[in-house]
Amino acid sequence: MQQNLKVLMLNGSPRANGNTSVALKEMEQVFKDNGIETEIILVGNKDIRGCIACGSCYEKGKCVFNDMVNELALKFEEADGLVVASPVYYASANATLIACLDRLFYSSHFDKTMKVGASVVCARRGGCSATFDELNKYFTISGMPVASSQYWNSIHGRMPGESEQDGEGKQTMRTLARNMTFLMKS
């Protein structure tokens, strides 16, 4: 019998119910329909320092900055999959999310191999591919299979709620969640 699968979903937007959230909620419903436990954590509006490469995490087993990154590391270790979602700012992810991911991946020393990763980006129009690539690098350097969809994992909208109208983007998120489910169950 297979254990209950868990997916940790990080929302890199500073807006809890913004356009990036629309993408995550589309995925979350597919996961729930497949009996997969989810947790969405808002990261983009938190005060998270960047990594200072002090190396203390090698001695202490966690980041020297005792904030939500250490809590996320515990949740990430227990999860079978990780979804990282970000709005696009100047063809890049939210800087707070990047600071979080740098520290999360560097300071957590558990084996990430074969945990399934997926990145999701939300933009008005441009910069998605660069941001998508930026986020996927955390997975690929960690030996994590990267889930894909039938198109780039992006949803489009600028003003609050606009991404609700992106039918293709929402379908891309549902397909992404189904593909991620398949990989986690494999």
Describe each model-derived feature in a short phrase:
Residues 14-15, 45, 124:
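Short, glycine/serine-rich, charged loops/turns that create anion-binding
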Residues 46-76:
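Cysteine-cluster motifs in flexible loop/terminal segments that predominantly coordinate metals
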Residues 4-8, 28, 34, 71, ...:
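Glycine-rich phosphate/pyrophosphate-binding loop and the adjoining helix
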Residues 5, 64-145, 150-151:
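Helix-loop-strand module that forms the ligand-binding subsite of alpha/beta enzymes
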Residues 36-46:
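A short beta-strand-loop structural module common to alpha/beta enzyme folds
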Residues 23-31, 135:
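Hydrophobic residues within alpha-helices
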Residues 14-23:
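Glycine- and acidic-residue-enriched helix-capping/strand-helix junction motifs
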